[in-house]
Amino acid sequence: VSPDAVTLIGTAGVVAGALVFFPMGEFFWGTITITLFVFSDLVDGNMARQAGVSSRWGAFLDSTLDRVADAAIFGGLALWYAGSGNNNALCAVAIFCLASGQVVSYTKARGESIGLPVAVNGLIERAERLVITLVAAGLSGLATFGAPSWLGLLLPIALWVVAAGSLVTLIQRVVTVRRESAEADAAAAAATASETPSETPSESGTA
């Protein structure tokens, strides 16, 4: 099985788990399914390196499908709250988590594409978003198996935390890109000025 196939299978499993179980309120089984397939995201890159087939295409595919998986997770939660969950506020928060996660990733990718290091990790990145959301969803799902009912509060709290953290991370990255771009432009202007030959005034005189 090729690393790309592992990436595709893993993403398909995450999308299926999120969009089948979460809209029905089956948070525990949805989390179990998603977690099993998320591990493929850790395996595919290592497989490619071990097999000596790492490529730009593989990196692009992995990053792109990560965005698809993230969208499915928060989209599934939004569908639950828009339907049987009957909570428009949390539906909006889940959609915000979906959108902000995509934009946070884009700001870093776009900054790097124009030659900036984007030297900031941010408060909450993809790994933190997934861990916080999936742990909370799984624990909330235990409430349907007779666990304490207060566990059901963990998912709403987690969504608010992820939303706030993603907003802070977005601001951090935008500020960093603005600073780095200003520094890069200033350095480029200084380099151009230093390369421009100085003009000496012409001497005039009478023969």
Residue positions per predicted region:
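Glycine-rich active-site/cofactor-binding loop and its immediate structural neighborhood
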Residues: 25-59
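Hydrophobic alpha-helical transmembrane segments
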Residues: 1-33, 38, 72-207
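Basic, amphipathic juxtamembrane/active-site segments
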Residues: 45-92
